[in-house]
């Protein structure tokens, strides 16, 4: 209905104004929770309603048409941006060890024994940041935000 009367740019603006703002609010805290799956289904439902397609249609191409990231990608992007903008809070492996290691430029992950920390956004963010190629890690924060 909305898509038939408005241009694609306006539909995207409506999505960002009404849904995306609520979707991304505090996502680094709740994005890894079991209820995030329900929110992702809701996001896909909104996209399908905007394009007036049936519920069995895949949303992958619709996300690409709208240039919108799906919820899991938004979560990963926000966590990586959080780690990049807060690098001063973390230490690299080179600062922890007195000898040189292969992963000396990676951020040090604190050893833990609880699954609570294992599911936290800090642990997940550090692991994801360490996986990034070094050319992305070396970018300034604002350029990093654009590349991610």
Q: What feature does the model see in each segment?
A:
Residues 1-148:
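Hydrophobic/basic alpha-helical segments
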């Amino acid at each position: 209905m909305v898509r038939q009367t408005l241009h694609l740019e306006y539909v995207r603006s409506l999505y960002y104004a009404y849904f995306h703002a609520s979707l991304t609010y505090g996502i680094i805290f709740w994005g890894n929770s079991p209820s995030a799956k329900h929110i992702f289904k809701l996001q896909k439902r909104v996209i399908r309603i905007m394009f007036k397609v049936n519920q069995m249609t895949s949303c992958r191409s619709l996300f690409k048409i709208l240039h919108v990231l799906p919820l899991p990608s938004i979560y990963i992007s926000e966590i990586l941006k959080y780690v990049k903008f807060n690098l001063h809070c973390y230490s690299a492996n080179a600062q922890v060890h007195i000898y040189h290691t292969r992963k000396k430029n990676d951020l040090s992950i604190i050893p833990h024994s609880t699954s609570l920390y294992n599911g936290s956004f800090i642990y997940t963010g550090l692991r994801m940041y360490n996986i990034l190629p070094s050319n992305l890690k070396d970018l300034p924060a604002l350029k990093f935000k654009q590349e991610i």
